[in-house]
């Protein structure tokens, strides 16, 4: 996949559920539609929670790297 232009990076390393998703929600609110938030996490629950959050809140999970920590998620605000 080509390079994704990230608007903001959110480091949630060391945080455990539900903190990473709460911070994603708080930070993505400040982005405009189409802007991209890169989330870096090491909580295994994020592999389930972040895709579910995107679906529920109508954001787009562009790409994720979840083979081994730290996990990375590129989330575009909106569809």
Swiss-Prot record:
Signal peptide: none annotated. Pfam families: TusA. It comes from the Bacteria. GO terms for molecular function: sulfur carrier activity. Its main location: cytoplasm. One of its GO terms (cellular component) is cytoplasm. GO terms for biological process: tRNA wobble position uridine thiolation. It is found in: Cytoplasm. Keywords: Cytoplasm. The active site is at 17 (cysteine persulfide intermediate). Sulfur carrier protein which probably makes part of a sulfur-relay system. Belongs to the sulfur carrier protein TusA family. This is Sulfur carrier protein TusA. It comes from Haemophilus influenzae (strain ATCC 51907 / DSM 11121 / KW20 / Rd).
